[in-house]
């Protein structure tokens, strides 16, 4: 069947939990969760580096808790699947170095005693906690999928999750932990997905694997399975370009193939390039860092805007100054998809009325002082169909519509 004419092609990628950068994200968030579990007020900024045979954990922490970081690192590596020198990395025998210092007192003072509190004295409790850094954060939502995510990144994540599942469950034998997926969709003149154009999967594997066999297995157990599970068969009826390990063999992977670092997959973590990004990474950071908590809040805001029927797509930007509680800026963009005769400025005013975007309020409303972060380290922080994440709640729809005087 001939494919519909495409106005544009858009591509997003995902990676598996065995990718070197994702190993680092997982280790950093595992340490964060362990500290929050024992001391919810922990301040954590932990970065991880992995390379051949060794893991380096560095950063700054303020906490009353003690956790055995080397053991946490080893357990996470083994859980991911790096449990033997044959696969290129062994969590049981690799080196682990830890260099963690105390959080800067100046940063701590700015978070614990905001500029508003120092200047005005008697302020609301939520005005006392300042942002942990300056910066800008974006949130995005679209109604092109049930999870309010862009279809390219949503499908790329589903493919990565399934690739890991078939490896761990032995559905497709001889796979190793490292892997990447990439999806290209055609979009029509109405800027809606019209058909699936290209799927790329690169997966680490054992030396004896035949490439033709691997392609057959991954087409059946990963690509076809995901297309059916996602319910997008109508977008996959034409000729789809499928590329499995297009570089050839992929035996050497994980930290032996490439060094990894926390925070290097920020587009994979968010919207696959469909929305703007403020530049701040998430993993290893406690929610006093607005890089993380405010980005989650912006997703919450954007998703509720779209779920309320105010727009088909929404992108929301917020900005903070270090040590200040109140945001210094908020911006709503609906890309001319706004409904009900509303302007972006009206939607923005409703957001300010309905959502409290001070860091302390975000942390309280989303209940962020909990060990919920390690599960987000791979396969995206937004639109997760396999996790119950508080920033994915559609719980302000009625309030937004009421603020805009809509029935």
Curated annotation (Swiss-Prot):
Cofactor(s) named in the record: Mg(2+); K(+)
PROSITE patterns tied to this protein: ADOMET_SYNTHASE_1, ADOMET_SYNTHASE_2
Cofactor note: Binds 2 divalent ions per subunit.
UniProt: Mg(2+) binding residues: 21
Keyword Thylakoid included in the entry's annotation: no
Annotated ATP binding sites: 19, 178-180, 258, 264-265, 281, 285
Record-level GO cellular component terms: cytoplasm
One GO MF term attached to the UniProt entry: methionine adenosyltransferase activity
Pfam families linked: S-AdoMet_synt_C, S-AdoMet_synt_M, S-AdoMet_synt_N
Binding site for L-methionine: 60, 103, 258, 289
Protein location: Cytoplasm
Family: Belongs to the AdoMet synthase family.
Subunit structure comment from the entry: Homotetramer; dimer of dimers.
Protein name as catalogued: S-adenosylmethionine synthase
Organism expressing this protein natively: Corynebacterium glutamicum (strain ATCC 13032 / DSM 20300 / JCM 1318 / BCRC 11384 / CCUG 27702 / LMG 3730 / NBRC 12168 / NCIMB 10025 / NRRL B-2784 / 534)
